[in-house]
UniProtKB/Swiss-Prot annotation:
A GO CC term attached to the entry: mitotic spindle
Residue ranges annotated for the SANT domain, each copy included: 70-122
Native organism: Mus musculus
Name of the gene: Tada2a
Ranges where the SWIRM domain occurs: 356-443
Protein name per Swiss-Prot or TrEMBL: Transcriptional adapter 2-alpha
Subunit structure: Interacts with GCN5. Interacts with NR3C1. Associated with the P/CAF protein in the PCAF complex. Component of the PCAF complex, at least composed of TADA2L/ADA2, TADA3L/ADA3, TAF5L/PAF65-beta, TAF6L/PAF65-alpha, TAF10/TAFII30, TAF12/TAFII20, TAF9/TAFII31 and TRRAP. Component of the ADA2A-containing complex (ATAC), composed of KAT14, KAT2A, TADA2L, TADA3L, ZZ3, MBIP, WDR5, YEATS2, CCDC101 and DR1. Interacts with CCDC134.
Cell compartment(s), UniProt: Nucleus; Chromosome
Binding residue positions for Zn(2+) 2: 31, 34, 55, 59
Amino acid sequence: MDRLGSFSNDPSDKPPCRGCSSYLTEPYIKCAECGPPPFFLCLQCFTRGFEYKKHQSDHTYEIMTSDFPVLDPSWTAQEEMALLEAVMDCGFGNWQDVANQMCTKTKEECEKHYMKHFINNPLFASTLLNLKQAEAAKAADTAIPFHSADDPPRPAFDSLLSRDMAGYMPARADFIEEFDNYAEWDLRDIDFVEDDSDILHALKMAVVDIYHSRLKERQRRKKIIRDHGLVNLRKFRLMERRYPKEVQDLYETMRRFARIVGPVEHDKFIESHALEFELRREIKRLQEYRTAGITNFCSARTYDHLKKTREEERLKRTMLSEVLQYIQDSSACQQWLRRQADIDSGLSPSVLMASNSGRRSAPPLNLTGLPGTEKLNEKEKELCQVVRLVPGAYLEYKSALLNECHKQGGLRLAQARALIKIDVNKTRKIYDFLIREGYITKA
């Protein structure tokens, strides 16, 4: 390897002659008894019998030349090194420039020789890299979790979503209009010249320092927006709604302090209080069971069912107070009585209102050209058309419900309605669809 390492075409890559300090050209002499470091001499110094310190002219020597084959009888070692250097300089596959740099071989010969001896050569099949790959192949394959990542939103210019995102451009990671957008105007007339007085020079430097502080404030605001995920305001609000009302109030209060702490610390603080609220509510529920003398969850389910029944009976007993407000209007009173009769017969109020309104149902939504349509399968497209929900909003609602389901180990309809504040009928259809397709599970 030492011998091959000295076969470079560039004379400056070789060690100089110890006698005349000139660059060595092949053939040259290497002393077999001196070294390390190796002792090299050019032919002129060798023929003069040059001696230096411990080196004597009668030492055994070795003639260094690359005029011998290594891998192919028609290729010398010097040509092998020249080929590797040319591939390194010109790039793999650029065989015409490789041949031009070598000057002794055609591009076909260079490509054939390189592919045969350096790519497909079985001699290099037992390299350290291949051995590591073989050892890794013996190990059992482990599943790598894959989470699909949504592309950053790219709303059309001057659209509602673009205005909600403050003109943020995801491809450039920047805003169309910067914070303090006209800060550079204060510098447009400043010019440092040698004739400035000390006071004028200090004044100009103060203006530049103020400009730097404004730039720092601009970058600080950008960092807060990116770190806390405030670019997509709709998604941010959707994530906020997954908390109970009490935690949402705390979230709103603590939002102004988010810039002081990091995003992870802020989220941990909110999550810890959300967990505290859930624990307090669960403790209160268990205390209610204990007050009622219940000691197991089987009896607790019966207690909840009976409690719900009592609440429904209490509402029915108060219906008389409701009908009194319609007593002066006979048509309104008749309509109320029919509605109560239908409710008693098992019809839901939503079905009743739809049948009594007499209005035609809205036509299916046309999804052509709407952003996010290509990310939906056929069943999801049909759902969005029937529910009249744009694909972008559906994908956000779906992502929020999936995250909450994975976090809680299941999802109830009441939780879904608290999470996405839209029409309850649409929420029910989305919830039933995700349950039916296996995206989420019931709690």
